[in-house]
């Protein structure tokens, strides 16, 4: 005689496996942080506190003008959020070279991008 409890346990484990697999296949969020050595005082020091970000990279546009041109950086600091390799949001400094966006605003954008998958 079959035990229905075992069927239920196996089914629950299978559903849990599928759920974990779908979470791992979710979109990848990466951030590129652009600034310049002469503007370190206005750097964005809270990027490491953002959640659900796969990688964060830093580029000094004063030392890498090719990146400045490629990503069309007009002021520093600039934060660009990429989802699956495609730019989805950009936050730029104001005229005083200070980042206007807050950590909460950037995190909200990341959360919105991830939720758009569901």
Positions of predicted regions on the chain:
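Bacterial N-terminal signal peptides
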Residues: 10-21
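Bacterial N-terminal signal peptides that target proteins for export
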Residues: 1-12
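Structural micro-motif
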Residues: 71-81
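Local sequence-structure signature of Cys/Sec-based thiol-disulfide redox active-site neighborhoods
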Residues: 24-57
């Amino acid at each position: 005689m079959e035990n229905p409890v075992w069927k239920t346990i196996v089914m629950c484990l299978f559903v849990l496996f599928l759920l974990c697999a779908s979470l791992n296949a979710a979109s990848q969020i990466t951030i590129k942080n652009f600034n310049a050595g002469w503007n370190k005082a206005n750097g964005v020091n809270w990027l490491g506190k953002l959640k659900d970000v796969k990688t964060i990279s830093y580029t000094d546009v004063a030392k890498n003008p090719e990146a400045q041109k490629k990503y069309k950086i007009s002021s520093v600091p600039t934060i660009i959020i990429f989802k699956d390799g495609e730019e989805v949001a950009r936050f730029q400094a104001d005229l005083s070279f200070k980042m206007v966006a807050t950590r909460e605003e950037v995190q909200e954008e990341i959360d919105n991008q991830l939720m758009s998958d569901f």
